[in-house]
Amino acid sequence: MLQPSKKIYQKLQKQYSRRINLDLKRIKKVLEKLNNPEEQLENVINIIGSDGKNSVLTSLKYFLEANNQKVNTFTSPHLYDVRQRFWLGNRFISLKEIKKYKKIIERTRLKLTLFELLTCIYILSAAKTDSESYNLVESGLLFKKDRTNLWTNPL
């Protein structure tokens, strides 16, 4: 079981805006400066809607895993620990990885919201996993302008 990582999340909340901004320009610019890691992710399934997204994502995850498929997931919000948002194959992301990817993203010197930062952390971490993994990505707000709507051909 994960131990709470409130300290790191509280620090992120202070450092990054939590306001909603329905614009994909910033996150796309950051990803471009990082050589478009989102393009390395295959089998992306965007889960959208107003209710039940996490239930659908969890059901799909268990179905795929029961069929010996590798699965990465990105969800929000987390219930207990920020690492719960990031499932990579068979484990949650580590705090060390979160810090590592945060530093990489900060080197772009572009200002992001907290959700944009977390989305970029997911993309960078998932891009390092098996290329045949399924990537189940829960949308945050509105699909068309949502930070998770970055792939040209999601499943």
Segments predicted by a language model, with ranges:
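ATP-dependent carboxylate-amine ligase catalytic core
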Residues: R18, L24, L31-E32, P37-Q40, ...
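Hydrophobic anchor at the beta1->P-loop junction of P-loop NTPases
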Residues: I45-I47
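Hydrophobic positions on the alpha1 helix immediately C-terminal to the Walker A/P-loop
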Residues: V56-S59
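Charged, amphipathic alpha-helical linker segments immediately N-terminal to NTP-binding catalytic cores
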Residues: M1-I20
